[in-house]
Amino acid sequence: MAEEGEVSALVCDNGSGMVKAGFAGDDAPRAVFPSIVGRPRHTGVMVGMGQKDSYVGDEAQSKRGILTLRYPIEHGIVTNWDDMEKIWHHTFFNELRVAPEEHPVLLTEAPLNPKANREKMTQIMFETFNVPAMYVAIQAVLSLYASGRTTGIVLDSGDGVTHTVPIYEGYALPHAILRLDLAGRDLTDYLMKILMERGYSFTTTAEREIVRDIKEKLCYVALDFEQEMATAASSSALEKTYELPDGQPITIGNERFRCPEVLYNPSLIGMEAVGIHDTTFNSIMKCDVDIRKDLYNNIVLSGGTTMFPGIADRMTKEITALAPSAMKIKVVAPPERKYSVWIGGSILASLSTFQQMWIAKSEYDESGPSIVHRKCF
């Protein structure tokens, strides 16, 4: 266990899009790779090529031209446990090069996940990887830790799920947590669709990865959508070019801000949900009237989908319009927010006060997977 001080805990933030893994106490994850398992589309014909039946992470990404890529985590929930096991195996043995039976492991999950999801995670860690101890933490809570606060509302938006989690004095307020199954992957799909209207066809799982890259490099959030649309229509100042892997350039104009606009107006993709600003506001309104002021003043952005330029200004504008007029609104967008869940996990797992919180293997052997609900909130 961690008391001796030599053995550091492992922190593994399994996102729908990327796995962030490393050692507790470090200030950044050692390994960041896509949560992808790829399988060959065609059978191998070359003798001695040593073809594998599956590839994980970056290797799957680099061979994507011949593979079908699958993400085992959808909307923050593991949908394919065999593939998930491959990802964990890859994380421990290939990326971090550690023996999991020697280190406590801190895992993360989305709030409001099905109970069975955490139980299965717990079971695989103890039974397949023989870890000595483990813990499952809520992603948004870790992000708040990383920002150095104990009170605030975290808007955490990754590749698969977005949620707003109000936290007061270190406690998440479960009744006020809201979840929106709209995140980065949906934006990528929408960008594929609107690029199609421009005459660029992206259809395969491999081509989706190209569009994701376009999204990450060129998209931004407009402060005023209508005004930006007018600007885009009247001049080509907003146009940018992107070079495809085969050298062909494509031009992208109003798609740059139309894509992330979905976050504020999900009806653009036919979703009946309200936008991230309304979700944040609704979440605050579900909290006790006495603590709302502290939440308005500490709106913390977290996750890769909050990395769009202009998102904090737009968020401030939208929340200001919804909140009482004299209310002080502060949106915090830490530069490292893409990894703030992992960083918070690194901080938590290295606290001396946390060491009694781990679920030990002996406790698991006694109580089974359901122990996770008693020990982890």
Swiss-Prot record:
Species in which this protein is naturally found: Volvox carteri (Green alga)
Chain segments annotated as transmembrane: none
Cellular localisation: Cytoplasm, Cytoskeleton
PROSITE patterns reported for this sequence: ACTINS_1, ACTINS_2, ACTINS_ACT_LIKE
Family: Belongs to the actin family.
Alphabetized UniProt keyword annotations: ATP-binding, Cytoplasm, Cytoskeleton, Hydrolase, Nucleotide-binding
Its EC number(s): 3.6.4.-
Catalytic reactions on record: ATP + H2O = ADP + phosphate + H(+)
Any Pfam family hit: Actin
CDD domains hit by this protein: ASKHA_NBD_actin
Purpose: Actins are highly conserved proteins that are involved in various types of cell motility and are ubiquitously expressed in all eukaryotic cells.
Transmembrane helix in keyword set: no
InterPro entries, A to Z: Actin (IPR004000), Actin/actin-like_CS (IPR020902), Actin_CS (IPR004001), ATPase_NBD (IPR043129)
Any one GO molecular-function label of the UniProt entry: ATP binding
GO cellular component, one term: cytoskeleton
Enzyme class at the top of the EC tree: hydrolase
Protein name from the UniProt record: Actin
Primary localization class, coarse: cytoplasm
Gene3D superfamilies: 3.30.420.40, Actin, Chain A, domain 4
